[in-house]
Amino acid sequence: MVPEAPAPFEEPLPPEATDQWQDRALCAQTDPEAFFPEKGGSTREAKKICMGCEVRHECLEYALAHDERFGIWGGLSERERRRLKRGII
């Protein structure tokens, strides 16, 4: 029987490497109803929050990659994201 080799020492990853972008999003600290308004409701407050968010670009990339059809993601509405995908914006 051959003894097992000791496991190599692994340095822990820095916190920012293990954080999900969603954990750093300003919307995670806000009422979600602002980001999913009723039809015809205002999106102004949600978009204002997004504009000051450090992960806005990651959020928008996620929404586009996952075809999110509802709510404000990365500062854009569903309609604005559709236009962006079609190259209109």
Curated annotation (Swiss-Prot):
InterPro entries with a match to the protein in the record:
4FE4S_WBL (IPR034768), Whib (IPR003482)
Q: What task does this protein carry out?
A: Acts as a transcriptional regulator. Probably redox-responsive. The apo- but not holo-form probably binds DNA.
Ranges in coiled-coil conformation: none
Residue ranges under compositional bias (Pro residues)?
1-15
Cofactor: how bound: Binds 1 [4Fe-4S] cluster per subunit. Contains 1 [2Fe-2S] cluster after reconstitution of overexpressed protein from E.coli. Following nitrosylation of the [4Fe-4S] cluster binds 1 [4Fe-8(NO)] cluster per subunit.
State the UniProt keywords alphabetically: 4Fe-4S, Chaperone, Cytoplasm, Disulfide bond, DNA-binding, Iron, Iron-sulfur, Metal-binding, Phosphoprotein, Transcription, Transcription regulation
HAMAP family in alphabetical order: WhiB
Organism of origin: Mycobacterium tuberculosis (strain ATCC 25618 / H37Rv)
Where does this protein reside within or beyond the cell?
Cytoplasm
Q: What is this protein called?
A: Transcriptional regulator WhiB2
Region Disordered: which residues?
Answer: 1-24
Its needed co-factors are:
[4Fe-4S] cluster
Note the PROSITE patterns from the entry. 4FE4S_WBL
Instruction: Tell me which positions the record assigns to the signal sequence.
Output: none
What residues bear Phosphoserine in this entry?
Answer: 42
- The membrane-spanning stretches of this chain are none
Tell me what the record says results from residue 53 to A.
Answer: Retains chaperone activity
Q: Does the keyword Phosphoprotein apply?
A: yes
